[in-house]
From Swiss-Prot:
The protein's name: (S)-2-haloacid dehalogenase 2
Name of the top EC class for this enzyme: hydrolase
Biotech exploitation of the protein: (S)-2-haloacid dehalogenases may be used for the biodegradation of halogenated substances and their derivatives which are widely used as pesticides, herbicides and other industrial products.
An annotated Gene Ontology molecular function: (S)-2-haloacid dehalogenase activity
Domain of life: Bacteria
Phylogenetic lineage: Bacteria, Pseudomonadati, Pseudomonadota
UniProt organism field: Pseudomonas sp. (strain CBS-3)
Amino acid sequence: MQEIRGVVFDLYGTLCDVHSVAQLCGQYFPERGTEISLMWRQKQLEYSWLRSLMGQYVSFPQATEDALVFVCNALNLKLREDTRIALCNEYLNIKPYREVRSALESLRSGAVPLAILSNGSAHSIQSVVGNAGIEHFFSHLISADEVSVSKPSPAAYELAEKRLKVVRSKLLFVSSNAWDASGARHFGFQVCWVNRSRNTFEQLGERPDHVISGLDELPNLLNFASADR
């Protein structure tokens, strides 16, 4: 592995499980929770990308809300205002994956900065990591809102390079989203793809430098594991 001077994480789906919202979805719409969550996430991503391409950028929370409205319309589900608010707020409480805290603790011993680069708004990022109890691990929380364009735009990835003041080739970008890993590799980051579900990597002209099945493998990959492990 080349020299690493900083590690930058995606948030949604990498550190925290977006489909933890399925439980609350199922409370409001019995037996439809997983279906809603899967469709909601896909449409959320599509809207964030399409808005960027159209030059009509909206914040990730707005794209999330718009996506939920679409899903309920498509599934012929009546979405009350209080339900919409509750479900969108649940995106601020998505749960960290089980290995996240221990992995971050080990990585912190490596004495390189850890950062998050997300399409989420600054408020959303702060809320998610705060509610998950992992905010203290990160020196920078970076939102694509700052450039009004979503990942995988190079302009979004450039934010991390500028904020950490580290040349892109010496930053490791970690994401479970193959489209994100492709975009980051195209930008010039070293990339680690977290393939928890044994998915097939996207055919977008780029390949990750490393593939792991969970973040618990990352400390050993970087040789930053704490002495007591």
